[in-house]
């Protein structure tokens, strides 16, 4: 059956700021307390979406979350009206305010893990929401992510959206950022590669930075998504690269159809994995980048592998890269050599995503890949599909509501909270989502 990959990109939220919340993500730590530009950030993402849609790659959007997220502060014991809570937290515990204001839901590669219908035992598209257990600011995301995905993939005859795994470290799940699918045509059965950083009773794990994904979580997600057990491989990421800042597998590897593009040090027991894939994926090709050409540290600094690898209609592939790759002499030299060689990657497209990149999120972080047949695509909420009208509407919406300068101190401004809620109210109508946010369901601005 004919199917296409649709990229669902996250819209950057109104409270996009640099707080250094993500230990193990070196860009996040390095840019802590810098001044952000939320309006520029959302527009950089929109430009990427529109350019790819115009080039013929199906593209859709996933909205941001409600931030600052007052219900989480109430859970932490802060009381009073929403405005009083903001004031108390800003004075007493500003780090909590930064955490509940994080715009991290924009990195929708962590929203869920997707199983196309061709791989599922019941023939439906499955999406299991990630619990993002390793970081408090990200663990807040799962309930609203689930509501958003149900509002987008609302036809239960075609789609199954599963709640996140229990919020315990044993089942830490980071979603599609630790998942690749390899195979031939998108509509044919593929091989799903789940990548984990740790498992119980396995002493091979990083020493400096946390391994966020457990094998136990990956196995549970594969079961929930009804992936045919004959089509699954579980592989461990190299703990040494996690300790160098590779906090998700999509910082060191990316796949598309029969191609796996990765660093030579990406996986533990990499030769064994490559041989497995060669046996199970027809026409499999591994493009392993030697450390002598691109070091792991340069790969992390430029997000070379946090790129999108997209299939063009002529059968060749386009590599979508952040501008940091072009700015790095060694990485850019390697890439130009790569596209000149005999392999499916024949072209590159560079985007300026510096607002997201400074928080540790490149092109691949910003998108969730969903393979859909034509019938399934028609069943997706049509209001989220990128086109000229939606691009124009979202830019006007961003101009109206987004600030062009934001610091951690600004998060306590009650006006920012009101601006955000008004913006999301408008957005849910624009995207035909219904009342997906807690503030819409309570019907009150103050608690």
UniProtKB/Swiss-Prot annotation:
Catalyzed reactions per annotation: N(2)-succinyl-L-arginine + 2 H2O + 2 H(+) = N(2)-succinyl-L-ornithine + 2 NH4(+) + CO2
UniProt superkingdom: Bacteria
GO biological process annotation, one example: arginine catabolic process to succinate
Gene Ontology MF term list: N-succinylarginine dihydrolase activity
Enzyme class: hydrolase
Record-listed substrate binding positions: 19-28, 110, 137-138, 212, 250, 359
Enzyme Commission number, as recorded: 3.5.3.23
Active site (catalytic residues): 174, 248, 365
Induction description: By nitrogen and carbon starvation, and arginine, via the ArgR and Crp transcriptional regulators.
Keyword tRNA-binding in annotation: no
Claim: RNA-binding is one of the keywords in the record: no
Keyword line: Arginine metabolism, Hydrolase
Pathway(s) it belongs to: Amino-acid degradation; L-arginine degradation via AST pathway; L-glutamate and succinate from L-arginine: step 2/5
Family: Belongs to the succinylarginine dihydrolase family.
Function in brief: Catalyzes the hydrolysis of N(2)-succinylarginine into N(2)-succinylornithine, ammonia and CO(2).
Subunit composition and interactions: Homodimer.
Name of protein: N-succinylarginine dihydrolase
